[in-house]
A protein has these predicted regions:
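N-proximal low-complexity "stem/linker" segments adjacent to membrane-targeting elements
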Residues: 1-32
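C-terminal subregions of glycosyltransferases and related glycan-biosynthesis enzymes
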Residues: 2-7, 37, 199, 206, ...
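Short, acidic, metal-binding catalytic loop of nucleotide-sugar glycosyltransferases
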Residues: 31-40
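A conserved acidic beta->alpha catalytic loop
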Residues: 47-57, 76, 98
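Glycine-rich, basic loop-to-helix element that forms the pyrophosphate-binding segment
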Residues: 73-89
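Flexible acidic/His/Gly-enriched loops in nucleotide-sugar-dependent glycosyltransferase catalytic domains
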Residues: 78, 108-182, 252-259
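Short aromatic/hydrophobic "clamp" motif used to bind/position activated sugar donors
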Residues: 94
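Conserved nucleotide-sugar donor-binding catalytic segment
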Residues: 150-243
Length: 317
């Protein structure tokens, strides 16, 4: 029988786990939740139409955990699955754990500490460790270098929202603990296959209070050949451009310091140079005012017609 747990100090936290064809990883992911030094008040797992036996493994791991519930559905995509799980959950805060990642043991305790010390926050993100397909921590390589670059830019310019556009130092939805009020206000995770995490972060900075705890590792992100972000780089680039255009539309000058000085110009120019998305950004900025809501805009921006058009521009003939 399901039983909501409320025995911990601080706010209630639900952990939601979207599962899709990760039978190799799901046991260790769930164990990282069960071994928390400050327990989750509930665990909601949804299998998103997997074709492997990951759901059976998850049920076995959670069998003796009355605060856990597991569901199955037809494949609906990560953003829909996360939204459904959050809708089922009851806590004040939500922590997402993708089924191939791990929480560090003190993640939830640390988030409760931060809320207690600094007051209510709408989103908390921490430091990120990197592991390989076999769960070995990595000290070098492409992903480690990417995270290092992202921190270097943030440390240099001190513009957290613009720095996310440059390189997403939060890395993944697994590194987000956020308030239910933020999720409600955002309209949930948007219909983006690759960048729903970045869009949600942009909204969090625009909407409320964000705590960055980057010097303490909160999660371990698994890098493997089946990471969704590796599927179709041309479509990834379209989604990134759309999210940046939306951030420029909604946040505008708040991406920069109040001074609008030479340092801001340098930071912004470096982001544009690094992303190399000027053609798409200019187009999206031109059409964005025609759409009443960002979900409607994203539906247009990620349509097959537009993706094909941009692909032809980038690779004519």
């Amino acid at each position: 029988m399901f039983k909501f747990l409320k025995k911990t100090e601080g706010p209630t936290i639900s952990v939601v786990v979207p599962l899709y064809n990760h039978s190799r990883y799901i046991a260790s992911a769930l164990e990282s939740v069960l071994e928390q030094t400050s327990s989750a008040d509930e665990i909601i797992l949804i299998d998103d139409g997997s074709t492997d036996n990951g759901f059976d493994i998850a049920q076995r791991v959670l069998a003796k955990t009355p605060r856990a519930r597991a569901f199955r559905q037809e494949n609906a995509g990560a953003h829909n699955t996360i939204n459904r799980a959050i809708g089922i959950s009851r806590s004040e805060y939500v922590a997402v754990l993708n089924s191939d990642d791990l929480f560090t043991r003190r993640k939830l305790e640390r988030c409760r500490e931060l809320i207690s010390q600094r007051g209510p926050a709408d989103l908390i993100a921490g430091g990120v460790g990197i592991m390989d397909d076999d769960g070995r921590k990595q000290r070098g390589g492409v992903a480690v270098d990417w995270l290092a670059r992202s921190r270097t830019f943030l440390d240099q310019f001190g513009l957290p929202q613009l720095s996310l556009i440059n390189e997403n130092y939060v890395a993944t939805t697994s590194n987000m603990v956020f308030s239910r009020r933020l999720w409600d206000a955002s309209g949930g995770f948007q219909p983006l296959r690759y960048c729903h995490d970045l869009d949600f972060l942009m909204f969090a900075f625009e909407f409320g209070s964000v705590i960055l705890d980057l010097d303490e590792e909160h999660i371990v992100y698994r890098v493997h050949e089946r990471n969704t972000i590796k599927e179709d780089l041309s479509r990834v680039r379209v989604e990134i451009a759309a999210v940046i255009a939306e951030a420029l539309h909604q946040s505008g000058p708040r991406l920069l310091s109040p001074a609008f000085n030479e340092r801001d110009v340098q930071a912004f120019a470096e982001v544009m140079k690094n992303k190399q998305l000027s053609d798409m950004l200019c187009f999206f900025q031109t059409v964005r005012p025609a759409f009443a809501a960002r979900g409607e805009f994203y539906g247009y921006a990620t349509s097959d017609m537009l993706s094909t058009a941009f692909r032809r521009i980038v690779s004519p003939g």
